[in-house]
Amino acid sequence: MIDVNNFEYMKIGLASPDKIRSWSYGEVKKPETINYRTLKPEKDGLFCERIFGPQKDWECHCGKYKRVRYKGVVCDRCGVEVTRAKVRRERMGHIELAAPVSHIWYFKGIPSRMGLVLDMSPRALEEVIYFASYVVTESGDTPLDKKQLLSEKEYRAYRDRYGSTFQAAMGAEAIKKLLQDIDLDKEVDFLKEELKTAQGQRRTRAIKRLEVLEAFRNSGNEPSWMILDVLPVIPPELRPMVQLDGGRFATSDLNDLYRRVINRNNRLKRLLDLGAPSIIVQNEKRMLQEAVDALIDNGRRGRPVTGPGNRPLKSLSHMLKGKQGRFRQNLLGKRVDYSGRSVIVVGPNLKMYQCGLPKEMALELFKPFVMKELVEKGLAHNIKSAKRKIERVQPEVWDVLESVIKEHPVLLNRAPTLHRLGIQAFEPTLVEGRAIRLHPLVCTAYNADFDGDQMAVHVPLSSEAQAEARLLMLAAQNILNPKDGKPVVTPSQDMVLGNYYLTLEREGAIGEGMVFKDANEALLAYQNGYVHLHTRVAVAASAVNNATFTEEQKNMLLLTTVGKLIFNEILPESFPYINEPTNSNLEKETPAKYFVEKGANIKEIIASREEVAPFSKKILGNIIAEVFKRFKITETSRMLDRMKNLGFKYSTKAGITVGVSDILVLGEKDEILHEAQAKVDNVIKQFRRGLITEEERYDRVISIWSNAKDVIQGKLMKSLNKRNPIFMMSDSGARGNASNFTQLAGMRGLMANPSGRIIELPIKSSFREGLTVLEYFISTHGARKGLADTALKTADSGYLTRRLVDVAQDVIVREDDCGTDRGLLIGAIKEGNEVIESLYDRLVGRFARKTVKHPETGEVLVAENQLITEDIAHIVENSGVETVNIRSAFTCNTRHGVCKKCYGRNLATGTDVEVGEAVGIIAAQSIGEPGTQLTMRTFHTGGVAGDDITQGLPRIQEIFEARNPKGQAVISEIDGVIAAINDVKDRQEVVVQGEVEARTYAIPYGARLKVIPGQKISHGKELTEGSIDPKELLKVTDITAVQEYLLREVQKVYRMQGVEIGDKHVEVMVRQMLRKVRVSDAGETDVLPGTLLDIHQFTDANAKVLLQGKQPATARPVLLGITKASLETDSFLSAASFQETTRVLTDAAIKGKRDELLGLKENVIIGKLVPAGTGMNRYRKVDLVKTTQDDMNVENDEVYVEQ
């Protein structure tokens, strides 16, 4: 028996009749299931205990042998082996068919494999198999051809004329005979000859046939095994029959389907024994064929067999297919024990790494641990009494629970889990009540709020699982977002508002200009009401404990506010004292202007200065990033907790809230609207005179009203008091934005109608004034569309993520360096003059491919294969270097993954990526997760007309599926000059003059040109506005151009929406789309022309023949969309669990495919550890060389302990 958990590969193939019989424990002869009186299985029926094993452990059918001591005995009365009942899950039976039947997958799939092997059309096959025509199996010495079809009438005529010199037959028997007669080697050689000359349709047909025949030849499958003589019967526990209350039975549909097969098979046997007329026998054989078809794949041919209530029965194929099928429901998504779920509430007093677990839930989850501990401490005599104690919830149980929970992390998960931060580990603390408490800072990562969200808890059981949870998944470790390397645990809402209020400055506040000897004195003054948080004061710099002050500065006074003194106490000592929200203050030191000599006139100096802006959400984010960069995880999580506490404390103290009086209506509003209305009337006048078209009129009216709204918005923002609560909320980034404010106090502006077209009648009222009935009605369109869109697009985005994960799931960092000599030349991504992604953003965390020198001094800025850090990237960007050649996933040579150097830095940790990191899945999540963000953005504005995300998600799908884009651009196929632009009838033509030839391009009606006569153009560049079709681009240029184009386009969509994604994630995805080539000429290799091969398979095949001095094959790169690419993967398990399950499995079985289990999904399906992270072989197969005892050199601050 193979070791269930450890095998190298998994192979699938066709089963021969002998193989099926060898699996079987006996023949099922009767259609009966169980006896309705005794409720015991009928003998020889579908649940027979003699075939499938006993129903009760260690007990035979008749009851002669009971108990374990008879293990292995076969009862002499009823013939049942005494064993465990669970063998009923694994023992199979079989049905001996009275006539061969065809397997519908191989006959009916597209392309029909049976048809390709026999070179017959599927229609002809169908006629033969379902007894409509005869087929000639032996022509003898008659003018008939082998495989020729004859109708009943023709057959009789030929029979009369030629007697028995030829043979013709019907049904699967005939097909079986033809399949047995095929000589594979002869056919293959014949087809290879034909390929040398054939063209067009004949060529494609020959290639298809060759592929199938080669598959049969190489896999050891016999073509005749596509016809079944024996039908396997799956174990009864996999098609159970259960008694419902009320004595009725519920049974799996498979039992009905099997029963029909057995009934028809038995009837056929009887008819054959009786020697019935052939027409009756044929009809029965056809019905048997249809019954077997329905069992294997119901509904594939003709009308599906239905059960009660006209519901189609679920056949074997349906058991595998779709979200509810075996693959996705049971193999890829299992339900697990030791888990619970509950509503979440906020836990503001928790530490970063803690969560609150309700007591009763914890008791249930940690039950086995508590029981063990109770017994060990002698509080219970045995496990049974311990269990009873817990069930009665006796008081001593709680103390034991406390000790068990210590140091035992739990995982919290919130659905939908869009990226890896959707599951994090926390140390549980017991809380009263029945709600889970969640730390407020991790809400962003989970996208959780406390309006009734629920979360699931899982307990990692083994010590390895606990260690991984603690070291890799603890919330305090996950500070950076894997998609862009920016902190994901930035404070939000109240916390932002509190810190904003704390760092405000106010001219002329109480006690302005006071001087204090240290921070404590200032605090004392604040607590006693002599100064306010916002008061600008001076403090002796020496007393502010800060390592970045120079000796000279320490003898001076520091100008700051009481609030900023409090704020700076949460930062590490060697961090600059932050006095203003600028990068120089953050990264270097406190600006010199805040230090004054002792004895200067403080009040004058302060009065002469402007107020410094307070710290908004963005600045807090930068502070966190900077602290993380310098002090790593431990210090950052401590600071975050302190920042959270400050935020909550001071937003409470500030008492900032919104009242109607805070919304002041703009006085000049009527005037502005009046002007706009006059302009609109003017435009309408011009339209009526016929000076402008309907389109122009519409566009102008829209733009007039948009401008009016912008003017109102600008004036509103200017007229606002900086202390206005709503302004403070939006300025700090806590909640709301300028657009909300404009709608409250200015005007709601233009709205879109249900089809998305902007209605030219604007809503002139604001919410403060109140809307008219018509205005309100117009508003409802947009609001409703927003909600409907959200619901639909969330599903779209989820499906996109699923496809992305599927195509990249086997991309894992597999080695340190692949040794490639190629790189990717990168510069800033621009759209017109606007920089979409700067060179700095693209360089950080990558390895340089070639040495980068300063353009003027020639000084080496980056050496070859050196990591580019933030500082180096700044130097490179400022030196005026335009492009840099870097290592990239695009050019990596590693098989089934990437290497450390080509990938660069792991964005989630800020350190080099480790071997074993599942970068493919991280890339998929990083691209898919913001997809949902984009999706949900339309929802918040309440449908105010603006840029909807229609470019967003659909465009991303278009790019990754490599579809022909909407509004496709015409591209030039040659380098040259635009010779002329001619008008022809109703369209234009562009003539490109190259060195050798000129090309003329017809420009579609309504397309906008991007070129002018005399302009130089290179191949692959657009002649008109629009998106390029990447497949076209690949034909005209090379892989590099396509890779760069796709990367640029994806980044454009996301950056326009304000979402940042690391380039490397897009690179990983695009690489997966371009990993196949199509063989155009096979040379002297074994590959077939026209087949899709992995680049590595192709180079291997060529290397093999080149060594023998033969002719290599040629191929062109192919761009596959992600769905297609997932289905083309080498792993049939992964492809089958993705989509088109039956097609993938049919193909794999005929080719006798081996799944080498390299990706993650395949291993999850068969229940092995995934080969990523600590599951990689290089980490599992570790031998102990010697044991030594040494002191651990770990400094205290490296281990996160908080007393």
Swiss-Prot record:
Q: So where does Zn(2+) 1 get bound?
A: 60, 62, 75, 78
SMART domains, sorted: RPOLA_N
Q: Which cofactor does it need?
A: Mg(2+); Zn(2+)
Q: Name one GO cellular component term.
A: DNA-directed RNA polymerase complex
* Keyword terms, alphabetized: DNA-directed RNA polymerase, Magnesium, Metal-binding, Nucleotidyltransferase, Transcription, Transferase, Zinc
Q: Which GO terms describe its molecular function?
A: DNA binding; DNA-directed RNA polymerase activity; magnesium ion binding; zinc ion binding
Which domain of life does this protein belong to? Answer: Bacteria
Binding residues for Mg(2+)? 449, 451, 453
The entry sums up its family as follows:
Belongs to the RNA polymerase beta' chain family.
Q: What does this protein do?
A: DNA-dependent RNA polymerase catalyzes the transcription of DNA into RNA using the four ribonucleoside triphosphates as substrates.
Q: How does it assemble?
A: The RNAP catalytic core consists of 2 alpha, 1 beta, 1 beta' and 1 omega subunit. When a sigma factor is associated with the core the holoenzyme is formed, which can initiate transcription.
| HAMAP family assigned to the protein according to its UniProt record, in alphabetical order | RNApol_bact_RpoC (MF_01322)
Name-wise, this protein is DNA-directed RNA polymerase subunit beta'
Give the species this sequence originates from: Bacillus thuringiensis (strain Al Hakam)
The gene name reads rpoC
